[in-house]
């Protein structure tokens, strides 16, 4: 862990370059560029709001904000972990030529997704202002669920990037997994409609309490539940440490599979 931190400080300028490169590549040859980070969640919010507000009569105040806040959280996790999955073999040519701490490639993918998260968060704020939703002081607590989400995603990304170097089929399986995971995360539906057994299943999803905390401070104007926060912190730290361990144990074999 000590060497990881030392390398992180030493190679910080390189990390910044990698993040900038990842963002540029993502929006290369796009007329609107990074603006799509604002527009995508807004378009999806409109579509989902129209569809689900007519199909299902959910008793949710300002359903558009409810959906958009769910998208902000889930899309970051899905995008960050998916991008992190290809971080190692996607940089094979560089890894083979020079020594670079390999975890930096994973961190850069997650950090570039974090920039998208900030843009999506801006879109959420704009919608709140446009709909005259109340902005309470609890919005100042938003960094708490955001930091937990980023660290948790980094832990998952480290595991996925290490495993995918050897087993590329993971990429296809993970697409199916994230689709299923979205329906096990209260992105488009309120928790109140779930029967008892399904409620417990959805609460086992680590993203659920993070999303609930995010919504509480952003649109519900309520404080974060301390017991929920403590459990989420433990889960996040555990996932991050697991990610570091798996990555560290496998990184010396990466070159053999690139």
Question: Each predicted region: which residue ranges?
Answer:
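Hydrophobic transmembrane alpha-helices and immediately adjacent juxtamembrane helices
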Residues: 1-258
């Amino acid at each position: 862990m000590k060497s990881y931190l030392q390398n992180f400080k030493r190679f910080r300028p390189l990390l910044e370059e990698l993040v900038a490169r990842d963002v540029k590549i993502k929006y290369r040859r796009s007329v609107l560029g990074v603006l799509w980070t604002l527009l995508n969640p807004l378009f999806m919010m409109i579509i989902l709001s129209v569809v689900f507000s007519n199909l299902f009569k959910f008793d949710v105040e300002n359903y558009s904000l409810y959906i958009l806040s769910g998208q902000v959280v889930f899309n970051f996790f899905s995008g960050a972990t998916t991008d992190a999955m290809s971080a190692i073999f996607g940089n094979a040519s560089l890894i083979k030529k020079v020594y670079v701490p390999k975890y930096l490639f994973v961190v850069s993918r997650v950090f570039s997704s974090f920039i998208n998260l900030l843009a999506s968060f801006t879109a959420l704020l704009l919608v709140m202002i446009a709909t005259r939703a109340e902005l309470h002081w609890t919005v100042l607590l938003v960094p708490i669920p955001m930091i937990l989400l980023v660290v948790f995603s980094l832990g998952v990304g480290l595991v996925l990037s290490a495993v995918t170097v050897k087993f590329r089929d993971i990429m296809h399986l993970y697409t199916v997994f994230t689709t299923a995971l979205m329906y096990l995360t209260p992105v488009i539906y309120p928790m109140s409609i779930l029967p008892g057994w399904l409620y417990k299943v959805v609460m086992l999803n680590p993203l659920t309490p993070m999303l609930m905390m995010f919504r509480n401070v952003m649109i519900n104007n309520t404080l974060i539940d301390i017991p929920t926060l403590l459990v989420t912190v433990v889960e996040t730290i555990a996932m991050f440490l697991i990610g570091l361990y798996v990555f560290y144990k496998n990184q010396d074999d990466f070159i053999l599979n690139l």
